[in-house]
């Protein structure tokens, strides 16, 4: 795959005007005190820059209001970042170190600027440049760089984003529960899991925080958080353009423009576009076209107004429209269930004179007679106000977002007219308001306190629809009665569901940091939650044979039934935690955390199972989760050119919210239930090593055990369908979606600075590999629905210019490894199951 990156930086067009502060001047030297000529000094996210002369002297005549970050760089040296909060304390001599020493990464997860190595939190940071170089343009690809992250997606709505195996239900999504992993972009909480399908645009950095973070973020996060920060508008005009080409018709284009919008540069803006297209990776013999393509368009704009040094106002608006013909799954295998022989999948399709198009899922061939569609549209606006008060900043973030979902699925995964329609069209709107203060309260005490409100409205548009076809009788047949063969009995028989979920949540949260000494720090945190959910669910049957025959009506009710229920639930809860941190020395920071947290009450929004013909209304409400968590770790710099971090963690959850599958067609998307107790424990390590100025190595490793300590009323796995028991005790068994081992390793080799393509830059060659051990893909452990372990290798090489034109080629899954990402049973548990396939070599 070839990727061309055009970067056009326009020259400065004037000073900041009368409002600007005084400039900055100084000298850039190396560690031996020798001047570094031609060093670049710039204001981060501003494009305002200067070049040092032959004696290393530079001058930046205009700078933005405090605080800001300076970047000083030169070929052969590490980029040096300086957070400027007080000009009086700023040195006039800036020392660059040889780039065989690692650069510290600055983050804002604790609502202030600090380095990742100094924060007593298990955190992984991926810069925007690292994500772009690795081709990680969305969360699904980013997971390869952070092994503790698991993402499973059979389409954008049915997406599971977990950290350490916790966060959301595995498999299909039920809209009635909250995610345990918070997803934030520029301080705004994104409530819908479909947001993880967004293409990254203008990303500055991605911070992945592991473990409960409810003391720091507005929305409660019991498993962790993604905190994504975009590049801010600059006061100097600039533009970037990037286009990538690849096999399967892949093309991706991104462009961004930034600069001042007024003469005094108090108002600046950034305008960004992105587009991704790729042909389908599966071939449908029925439609005679390739499906599972990519078709994404995104638009994002930012306006930033700085009327004074103390006040910054940022407006952001974005729209993303994704219209792929996807996401189809491939039949991956057939299991013999405990039903009678005539109810086995192979016997059923033999009676219907049907054969699967292939027995090898990696032929990537399907014969689906219902079109696949995943219309995914997200957008919104936000207004962020930062105002410096005393030694801190008061922040207000107001946001409105929407999500429109327009799908079509073939849930029987065959050419047979079994489930001819499965369309859960939905509309969602959310409003959030967060107010917080972060700063120093005294010389030894700092922290963050805040309040958060969220209001959500999710409704069908106009309804969810499931419809059977003429072959449904054979899959539903549970007796030898000839009544099942009644012509037209199930043809066009379906359900239309009107539902609405209205959610309101409020929280007070905060965390303090008390410097007991120069080395010992105590960080207590507390949170109060209020959650209210109101749901109305109304499902009506329609179609099929119109008859008054009680026997035929009874057969129809075995497939679909009317359902109606309402649920009104509300809960309040206190939670909190305590972190102790000790800096043994500058290169060794140890920490330990204990916390209790809470995941709100849930409601079933995909229909309820039945027992002896009666709807199990007791399952309409799902108990909240109670999470007890501890972790301890250390962040170290063994040498000046290396880091090594390790953390041990243990989480116990009571009333774990999980999604379970049912053989009932009426709840083929599964339903929510509580597992009494689960626990997750393990350790994680990550490290970086700058061998010399040419070679950089890095790696991550995660060991995770996730198990049900007590789940006495779990559904039976696929192969036990038809047994005398509908539920079983799976206590002591493993949870789905969690590999015992997962890791990544990589490195980059660069040349000395040279001229190429008319620009100064470096040649580079990089490789990275991601691997994970096998894992269960069934809520109740199965002998068959287990995904084998796999490893993939990616590579890239080319020329990276300091400014101007860069050119490089890259390949993912270079050895074309065939692997599954997820396995899931077909509706009705007839015995066949499908797979979400990993991408081939691209």
Identify the residue ranges that each predicted region occupies:
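Short acidic/polar hinge/loop motifs at secondary-structure boundaries
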Residues: 59, 172-212
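Membrane-embedded beta-barrel scaffold of Gram-negative outer-membrane proteins
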Residues: 384-389, 393-409, 583, 589-599, ...
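Outer-membrane beta-barrel translocator/receptor signature
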Residues: 178-180, 192, 201-204, 215-285, ...
């Amino acid at each position: 795959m070839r990727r061309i990156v055009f970067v056009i930086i326009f020259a400065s067009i004037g000073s900041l005007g009368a409002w600007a502060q005084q400039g900055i001047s100084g000298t850039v030297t190396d560690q031996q005190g020798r001047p570094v000529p031609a060093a670049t000094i710039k204001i981060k996210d501003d494009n305002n820059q200067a070049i040092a002369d032959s004696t290393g002297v530079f001058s930046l005549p205009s700078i933005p209001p405090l605080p800001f970050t300076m970047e000083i760089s030169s070929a052969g040296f590490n980029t040096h970042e300086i957070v400027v909060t007080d000009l009086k304390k700023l040195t006039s001599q800036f020392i660059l170190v040889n780039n065989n020493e690692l650069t510290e990464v600055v983050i804002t997860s604790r609502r202030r600027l600090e380095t990742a190595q100094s924060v007593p939190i298990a955190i992984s940071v991926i810069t925007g440049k690292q994500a772009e170089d690795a081709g990680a343009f969305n969360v699904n690809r980013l997971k390869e760089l952070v092994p503790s992250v698991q993402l499973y997606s059979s389409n954008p709505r049915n997406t599971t984003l977990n950290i350490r195996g916790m966060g959301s239900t595995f498999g299909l999504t039920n809209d009635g529960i909250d995610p345990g992993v918070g997803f934030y972009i520029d301080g705004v909480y994104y409530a819908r899991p479909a947001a993880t399908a967004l293409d990254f645009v203008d990303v500055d950095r991605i911070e992945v925080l592991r473990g409960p973070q409810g003391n720091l973020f507005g929305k409660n996060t019991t498993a962790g958080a993604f905190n994504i920060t975009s590049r801010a508008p600059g006061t100097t005009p600039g533009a970037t353009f990037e286009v990538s080409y690849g096999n399967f018709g892949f093309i991706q284009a991104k462009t961004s423009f930034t600069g001042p919008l007024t003469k005094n540069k108090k108002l600046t803006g950034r305008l960004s576009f992105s587009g991704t297209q790729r042909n389908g990776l599966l071939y449908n013999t029925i439609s005679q076209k390739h499906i599972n393509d990519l078709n994404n368009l995104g638009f994002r704009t930012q306006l930033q107004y700085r009327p004074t040094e103390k006040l910054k106002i940022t407006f952001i608006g974005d729209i993303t429209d994704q219209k792929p013909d996807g996401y189809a799954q491939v039949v991956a295998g057939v299991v013999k269930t405990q039903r009678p022989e005539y109810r086995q999948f192979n016997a059923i399709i033999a009676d219907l004179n049907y054969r699967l198009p292939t027995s090898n899922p990696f032929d990537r061939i399907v014969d689906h007679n219902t079109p696949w569609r995943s219309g995914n549209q997200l957008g919104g606006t936000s207004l962020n106000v930062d105002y410096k008060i005393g030694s801190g900043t008061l922040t207000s973030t107001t946001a409105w977002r929407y999500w429109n979902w327009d799908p079509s699925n073939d849930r029987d995964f065959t050419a047979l007219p079994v489930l001819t329609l499965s369309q859960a069209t939905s509309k969602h709107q959310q409003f959030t308001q967060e107010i917080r203060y972060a700063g120093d309260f005294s010389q030894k005490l700092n922290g963050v306190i805040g309040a958060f409100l969220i209001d959500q409205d999710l409704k069908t548009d106009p309804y969810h629809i499931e419809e059977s076809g003429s072959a449904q009788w054979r899959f539903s047949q549970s007796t030898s009665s000839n009544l099942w063969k009644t012509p037209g009995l199930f043809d066009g028989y379906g359900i239309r569901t009107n539902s609405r979920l209205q959610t309101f949540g409020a929280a007070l949260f905060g965390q303090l940091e008390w410097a007991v000494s120069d080395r010992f720090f105590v960080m207590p945190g507390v949170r109060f939650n209020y959650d209210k959910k109101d749901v109305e669910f109304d499902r009506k049957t329609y179609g099929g044979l119109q008859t008054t025959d009680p026997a035929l009506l009874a057969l129809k009710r075995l497939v679909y039934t009317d359902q109606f229920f309402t649920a009104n639930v509300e809960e309040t809860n206190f939670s909190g935690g305590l972190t102790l941190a000790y800096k043994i020395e500058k290169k060794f920071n140890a920490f330990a955390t204990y916390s209790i947290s809470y995941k709100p009450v849930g409601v079933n929004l995909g229909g309820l199972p039945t027992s002896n013909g009666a709807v199990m209304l007791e399952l309409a409400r799902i108990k909240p989760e109670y999470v007890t968590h501890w972790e301890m770790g250390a962040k170290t710099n063994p040498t000046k050119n290396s880091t090594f971090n390790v953390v041990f963690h243990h989480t116990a959850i009571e009333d774990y919210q999980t999604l379970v599958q049912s053989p009932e067609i009426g709840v083929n998307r599964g339903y929510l239930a509580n597992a009494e107790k689960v626990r997750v424990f393990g350790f994680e390590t990550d490290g970086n090593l700058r061998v010399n100025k040419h070679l950089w190595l890095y790696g991550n490793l995660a060991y995770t055990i996730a198990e049900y300590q007590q789940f006495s009323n779990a559904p039976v796995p696929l192969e036990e369908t038809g047994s005398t028991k509908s539920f079983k005790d799976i206590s002591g068994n493993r949870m789905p979606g969690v590999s015992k081992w997962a890791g990544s390793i990589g490195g980059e080799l660069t040349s000395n600075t040279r001229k190429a393509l008319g620009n100064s830059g470096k040649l580079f060659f990089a490789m990275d590999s991601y691997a994970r051990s096998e894992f269960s893909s069934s809520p109740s452990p199965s002998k068959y629905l287990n995904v084998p372990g796999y490893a993939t290798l990616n590579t890239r090489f080319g020329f990276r210019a300091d400014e101007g034109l860069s050119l490089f080629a890259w390949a993912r899954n270079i050895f074309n490894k065939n692997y599954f990402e997820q396995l899931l049973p077909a509706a009705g548990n007839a015995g066949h199951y499908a797979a979400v396939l990993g991408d081939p070599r691209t």
